């Protein structure tokens, strides 16, 4: 749901972009702190668009409920996404410029449980 919310925001941001592009990347990364806790293995997902970027005046509040850069938006998508990601022990961040926005999600992976699932499959 979190990734879908961010993807929908990217899609809506591209309505006036001449050659719209959304890129989703994922990778495994190691030993990074999230909210002061160091996790040994994490999944990082990045959603990148080439839209106009998030207006500077709302960037600091972008994860607050009811904050939206769109007139038709509810302002709940990013707030809900952040809550979902935090429930799973993860973190979300973004970088936005006039030529696009990148949202990055980091979520810890429990390698032991993945290995157990693979063995029982």
Positions of predicted regions on the chain:
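A short glycine-centered beta->alpha linker in the GHKL/HATPase_c
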Residues: 14, 52-55
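Short beta-strand/loop element within the Bergerat-fold HATPase_c
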Residues: 19-32
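Glycine-rich nucleotide-binding loop
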Residues: 21, 42, 53, 75, ...
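Short conserved segment of the HATPase_c
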Residues: 41-42, 54-66, 121
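Acidic ATP/Mg2+-coordinating residue in the GHKL
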Residues: 49
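Short alpha-helical Gxxx[C/S/T] motif in the catalytic ATP-binding
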Residues: 77, 81
């Amino acid at each position: 749901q979190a990734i879908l919310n961010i993807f929908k925001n990217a899609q809506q941001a591209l309505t006036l972009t001449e050659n719209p592009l959304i890129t989703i990347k994922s990778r495994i990364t190691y030993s990074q702190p999230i909210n002061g806790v160091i996790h040994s293995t994490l999944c990082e997902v990045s959603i990148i668009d080439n839209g106009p970027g998030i207006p500077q005046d709302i960037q600091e509040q972008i994860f607050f409920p009811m904050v939206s850069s769109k007139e038709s938006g509810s302002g709940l998508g990013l707030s809900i996404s952040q809550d979902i990601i935090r429930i799973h022990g993860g973190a979300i961040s973004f970088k936005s410029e006039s030529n696009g926005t990148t949202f990055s999600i980091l979520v810890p992976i429990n390698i032991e449980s993945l290995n157990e699932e693979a063995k029982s499959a």
